[in-house]
């Protein structure tokens, strides 16, 4: 069963967008590695001084293997001045109301 991964870090969402647009090849490389480890869906969100990543993964282990060995993510986070990421995982609940 898949898991939802939520990553939150302090940072400027505009800097994240700027970096991603200026480094699209690096972003695609990271995405390719994520696919190899089982990402199902991925999206960045931004709020007041916060960057949030919402992903669905085949497994928590797949995400951890990807994140622990992906060298470009720490470089990107340092460049944009993001804070230490807080990562949480959630499992789907069987509530008979999925859309």
Predicted features, each with a name:
Residues 1-71, 79-99:
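Short S/T/G/P-rich N-terminal loop/turn motif that feeds into the first structured element of a domain
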